[in-house]
Amino acid sequence: RRQRQMCIRDSTDSNDVSSVTQKAADFSDVVYIPTDNTAASNTEAIANILVPAGVPAICGEEGICSGCGVATLSISYYDLGVTTGKMAAKILTGEADISTMPIEYTDATPKYNPTICEELGIQPLDGYEAIEG
């Protein structure tokens, strides 16, 4: 059984994205990129390092995945807004107490980036939808 280690690398701004990504690629078989504005603004730079290195990225949201990742669990921000609005209405009308109200979620859709999957020779799992565009 192969031993796995976790390594956390973070980028504070766009000036260090390439060096942080290179360090992650050198150390990792796969990377996870959370939902992050710096990553979202630098997907091309990230892809230009990870793809040639053969390191797939699992991403925290569809926009980042469409630029540099292989897969994500995508949510609809519109649907999330509707759910949040309904929760707010319950609070404002007195139907719910914010301190005891359960958290509500929207469904996530498994999606993959067909271009990067093909470049890396990765076959997406059944049930994953291709990211369009």
Regions flagged by a language model, labelled:
Residues 90-133:
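Hinge/cleft segment of the Venus flytrap/periplasmic-binding protein
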